[in-house]
Amino acid sequence: MQENQQITKKEQYNLNKLQKRLRRNVGEAIADFNMIEEGDRIMVCLSGGKDSYTMLEILRNLQQSAPINFSLVAVNLDQKQPGFPEHVLPEYLETLGVEYKIVEENTYGIVKEKIPEGKTTCSLCSRLRRGILYRTATELGATKIALGHHRDDILQTLFLNMFYGGKMKGMPPKLMSDDGKHIVIRPLAYCREKDIQRFADAKAFPIIPCNLCGSQPNLQRQVIADMLRDWDKRYPGRIETMFSAMQNVVPSHLCDTNLFDFKGITHGSEVVNGGDLAFDREEIPLQPAGWQPEEDENQLDELRLNVVEVK
């Protein structure tokens, strides 16, 4: 019995460290991009997946000690997909005492009616879902819409656009919505997916499957995700370095004439960003930028679904 108690204490200690890391990552992202301000009413989009559960949990945690006052309202869109467990989210949110709204819209039926059998439904479904969430944000008086995309999602989007779209475009931590009426934020922008997965496992969130509509995962995105996971295993620090690169863009050393006035360079122009090194090679640090050793990776791997008692 004593040994079991010691194991539980160790698991709880490791979970606390993991939660502190996620809390620090979210706090830094909020500060860097001014995501949340005094008096904000944040609409937290809750899908029932590990990412949105984690986002809600960390935001609730930060809310208790933040130097500013802000409120949260969780919103789930019930799209009437077959097999969707309607009771799961209301029961979970009522247990937490979190304000919430379940929006019921049969977008599944609309998509099935409009899209021929065998064709991808994701594009239309996404547009319908986005419009409903924007409308709901207005109805609730929300000042910000929080989405659960994390660092890996942002990098995947960058490489998708580079490999298939021919542009360097990622997923913004904060930006105006496409209808120009709402501010969309991604508080998990600095969080690693593997940390979120461990946290979700340890907290035993009631996960709802994401493919109830029967759609297939985006093959191109899956290829990119597999590539990044392989790099993360084989080249420690590469993922951190790539994300750091997204925060240190040097337009003068790229080729976009909209971002830098190359035509305006004449004799007598100032040296910009170190100038052109011509035949000299740029010095590259031995340790990848932004990378820190995983000091407690083995300990964190011990977190499993059986740590239900940790709150």
Curated annotation (Swiss-Prot):
It catalyses: cytidine(32) in tRNA + S-sulfanyl-L-cysteinyl-[cysteine desulfurase] + AH2 + ATP = 2-thiocytidine(32) in tRNA + L-cysteinyl-[cysteine desulfurase] + A + AMP + diphosphate + H(+). It comes from the Bacteria. Signal peptide: none annotated. Keywords: 4Fe-4S, ATP-binding, Cytoplasm, Iron, Iron-sulfur, Magnesium, Metal-binding, Nucleotide-binding, RNA-binding, Transferase, tRNA processing, tRNA-binding. Pfam families: ATP_bind_3 (PF01171). Its cofactor is Mg(2+); [4Fe-4S] cluster. It is an enzyme of class 2 (transferase). GO terms for molecular function: 4 iron, 4 sulfur cluster binding; ATP binding; magnesium ion binding; sulfurtransferase activity; tRNA binding. The keyword Oxidoreductase does not apply. Binds 1 [4Fe-4S] cluster per subunit. The cluster is chelated by three Cys residues, the fourth Fe has a free coordination site that may bind a sulfur atom transferred from the persulfide of IscS. One of its GO terms (biological process) is tRNA thio-modification. It is found in: Cytoplasm. [4Fe-4S] cluster binds at C122, C125, C213. Its main location: cytoplasm. A motif (PP-loop motif) lies at residues 47-52. Belongs to the TtcA family. Homodimer. NCBIfam families: PRK10696.1 (NF007972). This is tRNA-cytidine(32) 2-sulfurtransferase. It comes from Escherichia coli O6:H1 (strain CFT073 / ATCC 700928 / UPEC). The lineage of its organism: Bacteria, Pseudomonadati, Pseudomonadota, Gammaproteobacteria, Enterobacterales.
